[in-house]
């Protein structure tokens, strides 16, 4: 067995929390293993003065880490699964997907407002086109502004700025202990999360069989099924992280449920599709559901919406 592992990670507080969490989980199973972290800056970390959709589509928070791994300088990388493009670079593989945290979005608001009680014309901050689209679909009267940066930075800017509220992922808010600021945990009926939201994806070299074997203990089978369904939809629609697509797969009482949202950035056009199926037990079956729902969304006009957005962001 390997005596040491080097984990590659971004250096934001949330990324470090996630890497330390994986380090601790591995240490429980392999107490003699020497595990260290290597901090790596990504494009998304370096360019902070532009909306994410304007600086690129795929791999903004992963590409540099993957390059370091391909040079054999780290053994594995811990990513927010929602940041991982659906096409993995040649030579790399997602070896484990951890059990998913609550993957709903949350509303942080200065007056403890909810989505429905926010004052007309209130300013809401988010860095996500997906959240912007779904929020404006629900509340076209609101003004949505872009806010980037790590969670600590966003909370500071929010407190000092004009926004009445901001939208974030529950998982990050909870992991960094900002939960007391949550005004509302948003229902899936109102806003669907990003593909893979709430789960961690652990990436390795495909030929590093020893590391891949060590990581098997961290894979959560149900989360793997659900997130691979979501990622299959995203791959079929040829969407990236900065496209307004929401998706949520879950297994309830033995039934696999999947829903998606594709919308224009202003929320005026929205396509919602869902599918439920019994006895989904393999990754292939889950991925097929993603393809079928993507095809249904395409038939309803999703391609036209996404092509317009890609053209605008080019």
Swiss-Prot record:
CDD domains: PBP2_EcHMBS_like. GO terms for cellular component: cytoplasm. The keyword Cytoplasm does not apply. It comes from the Bacteria. It is an enzyme of class 2 (transferase). Keywords: Chlorophyll biosynthesis, Porphyrin biosynthesis, Transferase. PANTHER family: PORPHOBILINOGEN DEAMINASE. The porphobilinogen subunits are added to the dipyrromethane group. NCBIfam families: hemC. This is Porphobilinogen deaminase. It comes from Chloroherpeton thalassium (strain ATCC 35110 / GB-78). The lineage of its organism: Bacteria, Pseudomonadati, Chlorobiota, Chlorobiia, Chlorobiales.
